[in-house]
């Protein structure tokens, strides 16, 4: 996440994600991403439920945000810019959750034999408990829409 600061282009990347890759494809590229995660969670063993359940919830949240953006941006292109950074972050938190779930899958059967794998599971549990829930507040920001961004006239700044 530190590369966001170093690059200084987070807003541009967010606009590219939402404008070109999500809205610009009618959600088709997003669907590929979501389908990969759904396949993983549907085929994961029961030992991974502590990760797959919240991952599915986060993905459902992202599905809802994506549908909301696709619908709202048809009539108001300002929604793309207004939602892009928060959407990028929600997308990123969900993608990281998927990566942590994959690492948990590789670690769950080895936790007792190796501290490395135990630490991977501990970190995954931390991520799911402390960081992934942030997608809820990001969703609220996205759904606040663009109206409040345009309440002030330029001379009021």
Q: What is the role of each PLM region?
A:
Residues 21-24, 34-157:
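C-terminal amphipathic alpha-helical interaction region
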Residues 1-14, 18-30:
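Catalytic phosphate/nucleotide-handling subdomain of diverse soluble enzymes
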